[in-house]
């Protein structure tokens, strides 16, 4: 079944924040080192943001005074990553539309009804249900850019009468990723009087591993399992007390995800035996959490419901030819296969 998805012109992945210090004329970093944009006078700046030149990324901009930003190499790399993730989201949208039409074809009498779903930030990594719940996670509003949604993010379900429990959704929204630790701000200022093995925050030796957006570091899960063999690992190796904290948080998140899946299955009338077991947490790309591979189990609930309904309404057709099963008197009455004629 072919599905036509109109491509959406989205420039958000080309948008960069302008350096406020540069606008005041007090930025001490050059444009090749500052993590914010230093646009020229010809660039259009709106609300402290500037759009990068797509032709410049391809190395083919010939405009004399381009109104778009020509980013330096380090910002160009960031934009290229954003572009790849944007393509992944567009492909996921197309495949999601195909799955929706397939689910609608399986249940022609039950129209697809949108059900309110908890909102997800631009990163899948910030949604605990998307990261740890195999039933609700694949059908994530993060697969659809927020700017094309008319209202709050919605989850499409094949059962029009069953809503997703709002309490469970709100509880899952509060859960955070367990492979991140907050960096000690006192340690960053150089005046933390607690040692690395006593402070409840991370003390990373390398400042490059710190995510400046939320002041956190990503924990090396291989090190937690005792199998990291990298000579210079780009992830944080936490001390023993922080390892115990991470393991406890993972256990709590897994228990909450299992409880939420069970509650949703009970509300939708699906027995637990129909649902597959909980898999491991899917790997997420570090930049914005977009999954590189589309999950084929995106409509596990819908397919399970469809199978249950089809089993109830489908008539039994025994194998064999219809003529062979017709009584002999009926065949003679209708003059079928009579050699005397």
Curated annotation (Swiss-Prot):
Q: Which Pfam families match?
A: zf-CCCH, zf-CCCH_10, zf-CCCH_2
Choose one Gene Ontology CC annotation of this protein and give it.
nucleus
UniProt tissue specificity? Highly expressed in cardiac and skeletal muscle. Weakly expressed in heart and eye (at protein level).
Identify the main location. nucleus
Mark the C3H1-type zinc finger spans by residue number: 13-41, 47-73, 178-206, 214-240
Keyword annotations from UniProtKB, A to Z: Cytoplasm, Metal-binding, mRNA processing, mRNA splicing, Nucleus, Phosphoprotein, Repeat, RNA-binding, Zinc, Zinc-finger
Q: Which domain of life is it from?
A: Eukaryota
Annotated Gene3D superfamilies = 3.30.1370.210
Annotated GO biological processes are:
alternative mRNA splicing, via spliceosome; embryonic limb morphogenesis; in utero embryonic development; mRNA splice site recognition; myoblast differentiation; nervous system development; regulation of RNA splicing; RNA splicing
Subunit structure and binding partners: Interacts with DDX1 and YBX1. Interacts with HNRNPH1; the interaction in RNA-independent. Interacts with RBPMS; the interaction allows cooperative assembly of RNA-bound stable cell-specific alternative splicing regulatory complexes.
Relate the protein's function as given in its record.
Answer: Mediates pre-mRNA alternative splicing regulation. Acts either as activator or repressor of splicing on specific pre-mRNA targets. Inhibits cardiac troponin-T (TNNT2) pre-mRNA exon inclusion but induces insulin receptor (IR) pre-mRNA exon inclusion in muscle. Antagonizes the alternative splicing activity pattern of CELF proteins. Regulates the TNNT2 exon 5 skipping through competition with U2AF2. Inhibits the formation of the spliceosome A complex on intron 4 of TNNT2 pre-mRNA. Binds to the stem-loop structure within the polypyrimidine tract of TNNT2 intron 4 during spliceosome assembly.
PANTHER family for the chain: MUSCLEBLIND-LIKE PROTEIN, MUSCLEBLIND-LIKE PROTEIN 1
User: Belongs to which family?
Assistant: Belongs to the muscleblind family.
Protein name from the UniProt record: Muscleblind-like protein 1
Organism equals Mus musculus
* Gene, per the UniProt record: Mbnl1
């Amino acid at each position: 079944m072919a599905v036509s998805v109109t491509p959406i012109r989205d420039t958000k992945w080309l948008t960069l924040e302008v350096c406020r210090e540069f606008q005041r004329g007090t930025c001490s970093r050059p444009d090749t080192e500052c993590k914010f944009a230093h646009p020229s006078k010809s660039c259009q700046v709106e609300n402290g943001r500037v759009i990068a030149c797509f032709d410049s990324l391809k190395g083919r901009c010939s405009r004399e005074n381009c109104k778009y930003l020509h980013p330096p190499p380090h910002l160009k790399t960031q934009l290229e990553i954003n572009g790849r993730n944007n393509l992944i989201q567009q492909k996921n949208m197309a495949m999601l539309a195909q799955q929706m039409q397939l689910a609608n074809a399986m249940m022609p009498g039950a129209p697809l009804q949108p059900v309110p779903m908890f909102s997800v930030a631009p990163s899948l990594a910030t949604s605990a249900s998307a990261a740890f719940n195999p039933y609700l996670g694949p059908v994530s509003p993060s697969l659809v850019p927020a700017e094309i949604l008319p209202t709050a993010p919605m989850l499409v379900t094949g059962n029009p009468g069953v809503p997703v429990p709002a309490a469970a959704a709100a509880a899952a929204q509060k859960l955070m990723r367990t492979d991140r630790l907050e960096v000690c701000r006192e340690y960053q200022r150089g005046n933390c009087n607690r040692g690395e093995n006593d402070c409840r925050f991370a003390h990373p030796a390398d400042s490059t591993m710190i995510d400046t957006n939320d002041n956190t570091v990503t924990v090396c899960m291989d090190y937690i399992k005792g199998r990291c063999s990298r000579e210079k690992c780009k992830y944080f190796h936490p001390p023993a007390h922080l390892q115990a904290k991470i393991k406890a948080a993972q256990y709590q998140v897994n228990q909450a995800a299992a409880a939420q899946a069970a509650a949703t299955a009970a509300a939708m009338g699906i027995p637990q035996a129909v649902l597959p077991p909980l898999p491991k947490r899917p790997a997420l790309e570090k930049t914005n959490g977009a999954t590189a591979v589309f999950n084929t189990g995106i409509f596990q609930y819908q397919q399970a419901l469809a199978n249950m309904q089809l089993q109830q309404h489908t008539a039994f057709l025994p194998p064999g030819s219809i003529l062979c099963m017709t009584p002999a008197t009926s065949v003679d009455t209708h003059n079928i296969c009579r050699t005397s004629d």
